[in-house]
Amino acid sequence: MDIRSTDTSLLTWTGDTLALGLPEGAIEIAGELAELNDKLGGNLGDLISETEFEGKLGSSAATRLGGGPIRKLILVGLGKTADFDLQTLRLAAAAIARLAKQQKSQALAISLPVVGDQSATAGAITEGLLLATHQDTRFKSTKEEKGAKLETVELLGLGEQASAIAKSEQICSGVILARELVNAPANTVTPLTMAETAEQIAAEYGLSLNILEQEECESLGMGAFLGVAKASDIPPKFLHLIYKPQGTPKRKLAIVGKSLTFDSGGLNIKGAGSGIETMKMDMGGGAATLGAAKAIAQLQPEVEVHFICPATENMISGRAMHPGDILTASNGKTIEVNNTDAEGRLTLADGLVFAEKLEVDAIVDLATLTGACVIALGDDIAGLWSSDESLAAQIQEAAKLAGEKFWPMPLEEKYFEGMKSQIADMKNTGPRPGGSITAALFLKQFINNTPWLHLDIAGPVWSDKENGVNNSGATGFPVRTLVNWVMANN
């Protein structure tokens, strides 16, 4: 899809399909809309009245106009003017893209209000278009593409914004990579595949890559990570991908993503009704980490970023860790495994220790960590825990810019009492109440002084149905937040 911005107004544009975004309220055909209505032979007014279109958020209407200067007309509602933000533009662009597909449009022009500035507006619209039109059909034997495809999109009245559009295309390439990694089944994406993906990113964009094999992980004392990996016939891969700017970096950051390419639960096996068939998505944190790496490598900020993915499976075999085993993490702390299905935090423990040894300025980890977080916050909102208020504020600002939702959660130290072990330093799970909080408190034991933030993304990494800029399946959450955070440190 070729997306470009232009000074052309909606009154002078001619072509296949014109899409307008209109705010909520009684829509008056006056001024520019009156001129457009005249140009379209009264069809704009007819469409508004016949469909009772009032501009409510999520509403839309479309019609074919015949053989005039514009052949199809699309209207989308933007909601209340006071609530306009960049996410309004993304959602409007996504709705327009889907309607244009239904109308079999090949050339599309979009007229939406400016939010912030023209550059930010063009970028947000581009994101909405690209993310809504992405369809992962790799595993279909018969492709469902029929008829015309959307080939060109003009963003009207925004002037030349090629740089902003290119930036959004680069960010979306990372989101799409994350989506496709999560969408793929566990017999396609394994720890080896994760390593190959990291190699491709490193080769294409000039990043450094260090893949720690099992023996190297053993030499570093990564007993928690390797305890999870023991049962799988596929060897673990501890991935360390590094982006460095050409000059002196302004900051050094680390992103650590949980990378369980399949989670059977281990000997505490996931039973009927547990959603075991969806556990290909348990590497959503690692997928987003690699997606962010791909985007950041293209954007080239003056920030050094370390992307860390402890990749393995959690399987069942004669070698599997047992409930009751004691593991020693790479910082020397001992863990009594009272549930083998709380394995993600074990892999992250060694990932966090590794990250802190790099002497970075801040560490963010992200993981599909707990069902408890989904119960608390639902499918659309991720949980956020942090030891540092400034870092938490940075991530929340980055998320707001991306239109991705997080909710700050407490690190209630009292709850860690339930994770204390009589024979080790800690257990890997606590009592059922506050399960997402105790999981975050567990991770906190593997950070000393570096500002640290944990994201539990178990809900938003997947959507069972079309939702905003996402189609059903993997969402690529929260690649755009991570990228915005890194760029804000630039």
UniProtKB/Swiss-Prot annotation:
Chain residues that bind Mn(2+) 2: K258, D263, D282, E343
SUPFAM superfamilies in alphabetical order: Macro domain-like (SSF52949), Zn-dependent exopeptidases (SSF53187)
GO cellular component: cytoplasm
Catalytic activity: Release of an N-terminal amino acid, Xaa-|-Yaa-, in which Xaa is preferably Leu, but may be other amino acids including Pro although not Arg or Lys, and Yaa may be Pro. Amino acid amides and methyl esters are also readily hydrolyzed, but rates on arylamides are exceedingly low; Release of an N-terminal amino acid, preferentially leucine, but not glutamic or aspartic acids
Protein's UniProt keywords contain Manganese: yes
TM segment ranges: none
Entries under InterPro entries matching the protein: Leucine_aapep/pepB, Macro_dom-like, Peptidase_M17_C, Peptidase_M17_leu_NH2_pept, Peptidase_M17_N
GO biological process: proteolysis
Subcellular location: Cytoplasm
Cofactor(s) this protein requires: Mn(2+)
Enzyme Commission no: 3.4.11.1, 3.4.11.10
Classification via Pfam families: Peptidase_M17 (PF00883), Peptidase_M17_N (PF02789)
Purpose: Presumably involved in the processing and regular turnover of intracellular proteins. Catalyzes the removal of unsubstituted N-terminal amino acids from various peptides.
The name this protein goes by in its record: Probable cytosol aminopeptidase
Originating organism: Microcystis aeruginosa (strain NIES-843 / IAM M-2473)
Gene: pepA
